[in-house]
Amino acid sequence: MKFSVIIPFANAEATLPTCLDSVVAAADRLAAARPACGAEIICVNGGSRDRSAALVAARAAHDGRLVVRAEAPREAGAGAARNRGMDLATGDYLVFVDADDTIAPEALVSLADATADIVTFLPPQGTFDLTRPEGRRATFSPLVGNLLAWNAAYRRAAVAGLRFPNLCNHEDLVWTCGMYARAKTLVGGVRPWYRYDAHVAGSAANSHSGRRVAAAWAATSRMWRAVRPAFAGNGVRLRAVMLRKLAMHLVLHVLAEVPRALAARRGARRGGRP
């Protein structure tokens, strides 16, 4: 078993060292516990203007076994960086880690026996055959709209050809909906391995603009298009569940952006006065 840990980064010099430390620790733990397994760490520069790229280069000089440096198109966003990372990946499973987050030391060891297309710590707990209607019914509502790039591991062979869209936010929701729609097997409710920091200033979750509002709306419509063809005849109340998901997504992730966007616009206008 080999893992490809993909870390997109841009202007993350404050958090990237801690992130890398956690991933390297998980890779070392894997090598010690499961000598037949391995990991590669693919750090993709999404257009940093700070010292992030230099930090990765310094780490690569001391640990060339684990760190691969690559460039994504400048200002193309996290989706393009993840796409570039997938192009370079050679592992059996893909694990995505944001540069302002960390993973637990036992993260990769806990995934070393994975065989499913998707392995997530989200509920429901168990192993599900997604080629059967009961598998889709049990997992659709809890996962669609909640499954993100970082809260699951994905079998690389099942990912083939699936790309993150060019959106400034919520691009991973579109990708995970597409992945869920094509997956044949899923394991849920495993022990959490990811440590998400929602409070890091400048992180994607804390960056707001009018452009993000438009991107969030675009993501909701793409999510619908991604999952709809896969569920005909599966007994899933697709329209009711998806509309509820989209409404929640709209309220929580789109309308919540509007006051911030308006405040930013008012501030820009005041700042532009003579």
Feature locations, PLM:
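Short, well-formed alpha-helical segments that are part of the catalytic scaffolds
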Residues: 12-31
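A conserved acidic beta->alpha catalytic loop
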Residues: 15, 22, 45-55, 74-75, ...
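Short beta-strand/loop segment that forms part of the nucleotide-sugar
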Residues: 32-47, 69-73
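Acidic donor-binding/catalytic loop of UDP-sugar-dependent glycosyltransferases
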Residues: 51, 101-113
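Glycine-rich, basic loop-to-helix element that forms the pyrophosphate-binding segment
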Residues: 72-89
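Short aromatic/hydrophobic "clamp" motif used to bind/position activated sugar donors
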Residues: 94
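Conserved nucleotide-sugar donor-binding catalytic segment
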Residues: 137-210
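C-terminal subregions of glycosyltransferases and related glycan-biosynthesis enzymes
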Residues: 188, 192-274
